[in-house]
Design a protein with these regions (language model features):
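Feature captures hydrophobic
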Residues: 1-155, 159-161, 167, 174
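Conserved class I S-adenosyl-L-methionine
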Residues: 177-185
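Conserved SAM-binding loop of SAM-dependent methyltransferases across substrates and taxa
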Residues: 188-199
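Conserved SAM-binding loop
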Residues: 216-217
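A short acidic, Gly/Pro-enriched loop at the edge of an enzyme's catalytic core
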Residues: 237-246
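A short glycine-rich, Lys/Arg-flanked "PGG" loop and its adjoining helix->strand segment in the class I
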Residues: 261-274
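Conserved beta-strand signature within the Rossmann-like core of class I S-adenosyl-L-methionine
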Residues: 274-282
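Substrate-binding/catalytic lobe of Class I Rossmann-like enzymes that use SAM or dcSAM, i.e.
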Residues: 282-393, 407
Length: 413
C-alpha cells in the first residue's frame, strides 16, 4: 500500500510542479525532485504513511493537517517557502484531485454557508474568542484584524492601519459632527473609536464575539468615549434603528452567499435615505468558488471570500446603489507579511499560551493567506453604497481631499 501511495503522490507532484524546485523525502527514506528550475525552492520530509495517504486523497485539507501534526516537515526551509512553491504551481490547475474536491465543495456550498444567527455566533467564537493576548502579539496596537492600506508601499503596520481607517472614513463622507454610525462587525473597537474621536461621530458597534465585546467596551471607557461609542453583542439581522452611516470591515466574509439578500436588505432598512455605507471585504478575481477545506475547518468555519459578481447582484436587487467600487490588490498580502513576521518574532510567547501545534496551525494560516493574495487571485473590494444618487458628490475629489486633510494617531492604545 505504501508503494501505491508514493506512486500516486509522485504523479500528482510530477503533473503539478513546473516552476522552481520541490524535493521530497518519502516515509521509506527515498527521495525525489520535482520541477525544472532553481527558484522558488523548498524541501519536505513526509514522515509517515498516514500523512501521505491523506494528502493523496485530499491535499487541500491534508497538507495543512500534516504540517500541524508533524507528518510533513519542511527541510532547511519554512512552511512559507513550501507553500510558495506549491501555490505558485497549482494556481495554474492540472491537479485532478484538487479540482474534484473543489467541485464537490462548490456543490455543498449552500449548506456549508447557511449561517443563521446561532451558527454565525458559533463560527465567530471559533476564531475571535481566542485568548486576547494572542492577537496583541502579532496585530498592530489598535488590533486592526483586517487589510491595511499602503498608499506609499513602505508604511509600518501601524501607519498602514491608520491609513486604512482614514481611507474608509473619507468614503463614508463624515462631513459634520454627531453623525450616527453603525459598525457591523466592530471587532476590538478600533474603527468605532477612531470615527468617534477624530470625526465626532456617534457610533454603535455590533459583534458576535464576547471576548471582543468586553475589550471594545473597556477601550471605550479608558478613552473617555463611552458617551459617543456603544458596543453591543448583536447579529446584524437584529438591528432595527436607522443610521446616517454604516461601515462593515472584514465581516462580510462570514455572511455566506445564501444570506447576501438579507444582508443588503438590512443595510437598506438601517441606512437613512441620504446615508452612506461602506463595505470592505475579501474577494476573488477568478469567479465564484469555494473556501479551502483547511481554512473552513480550522480558521473560519462558514467563511467565504466571494467574487464581486456574487455581491453586486443581490446588492442591486435590494434597490441599493453602488456609488463607488475600489479593488485593493496586494495590500492584504503586505498586511499578512507583517503579521507573519510579528507572529514569528513572538512565537515562544504564543506557544506558552497555547502549544506548538497551535503555532504551526497559525503559521500555515498566515502564510497560506498571504500567498492567496500574492499568487491565488484574492483581493479586497470596497463598495460605497447609497440609497440616493445625490447622497455623495458627483466626483471622487471629496474623498481625496478629506483623506489628505485628515490626520490622527496611528493607533489608539
Amino acid at each position: 500500500m505504501g508503494g501505491t501511495l508514493k506512486i500516486l503522490m509522485d504523479r500528482i507532484l510530477t503533473g503539478a510542479i513546473r516552476e522552481g524546485r520541490f524535493d521530497v523525502i518519502w516515509p521509506d527514506g527515498s527521495s525525489s525532485r520535482y520541477g525544472n528550475g532553481e527558484t522558488p525552492a523548498a524541501a519536505v520530509h513526509i514522515r509517515n504513511q498516514a500523512a501521505l495517504r491523506r494528502m493523496v486523497i485530499n491535499p487541500g485539507l491534508a497538507v495543512g493537517e500534516a504540517y500541524m501534526d508533524e507528518g510533513l516537515v519542511p527541510l532547511n526551509c519554512s512552511i512559507h517557502e513550501v507553500l510558495t512553491v506549491l501555490l505558485q504551481n497549482i494556481r495554474h490547475g492540472g491537479v485532478p484531485v484538487i479540482e474534484w474536491n473543489l467541485k464537490l465543495a462548490r456543490i455543498l456550498r449552500p449548506f456549508i454557508q447557511a449561517n443563521n444567527a446561532v451558527r454565525a455566533k458559533h463560527n465567530v467564537a471559533h476564531h475571535y474568542d481566542l485568548n486576547g493576548r494572542l492577537y496583541s502579539l502579532f496585530l498592530d496596537r489598535d488590533r486592526q484584524y483586517s487589510c491595511a492600506y499602503f498608499p506609499r508601499g513602505d508604511e509600518t503596520l501601524e501607519e498602514a492601519q491608520a491609513a486604512k481607517k482614514r481611507h474608509i472614513a473619507a468614503k463614508l463622507r463624515l462631513d459634520r459632527p454627531d453623525l450616527t454610525v453603525l459598525d457591523i462587525g466592530s471587532g476590538w473597537g478600533g474603527m468605532a473609536l477612531t470615527l468617534a474621536k477624530d470625526f465626532g461621530a456617534r457610533v454603535t458597534g455590533i459583534t458576535l464575539s464576547e471576548e471582543q465585546l468586553a475589550e471594545a467596551r473597556a477601550r471605550a471607557a479608558a478613552s473617555g468615549l463611552s458617551d459617543r461609542v456603544n458596543f453591543e453583542l448583536m447579529d446584524y439581522r437584529a438591528v432595527t434603528q436607522q443610521y446616517d452611516r454604516i461601515v462593515s470591515v472584514g465581516m462580510f466574509e462570514h455572511v455566506g452567499v445564501p444570506n447576501y439578500p438579507t444582508y443588503f436588505e438590512t443595510i437598506k432598512r438601517c441606512l437613512k435615505p441620504d446615508g452612506v455605507a461602506l463595505l470592505h471585504a475579501i474577494g476573488r478575481f477568478d469567479g465564484p468558488s469555494a473556501t479551502n477545506e483547511w481554512i473552513a475547518k480550522y480558521i473560519f468555519p462558514g467563511g467565504y471570500s466571494p467574487a464581486l459578481s456574487e455581491v453586486l447582484a443581490p446588492l442591486e436587487k435590494s434597490g441599493l446603489i453602488s456609488a463607488d467600487i475600489e479593488i485593493l490588490r496586494l495590500h492584504y498580502a503586505k498586511t499578512l507579511a507583517h503579521w507573519r513576521r510579528r507572529f514569528a518574532a513572538n512565537r515562544d510567547a504564543i506557544a506558552a499560551i497555547y502549544d506548538e501545534r497551535f503555532c504551526r496551525m497559525f503559521e500555515f494560516y498566515l502564510s497560506g493567506s498571504e500567498l492567496a493574495f500574492r499568487l491565488n487571485n484574492h483581493m479586497i473590494f470596497q463598495i460605497q453604497i447609497v440609497r440616493d444618487q445625490e447622497a455623495v458628490p458627483l466626483t471622487r475629489d471629496y474623498m481625496f481631499e478629506q483623506e489628505r486633510s485628515t490626520t490622527f494617531a496611528a493607533a489608539a492604545d
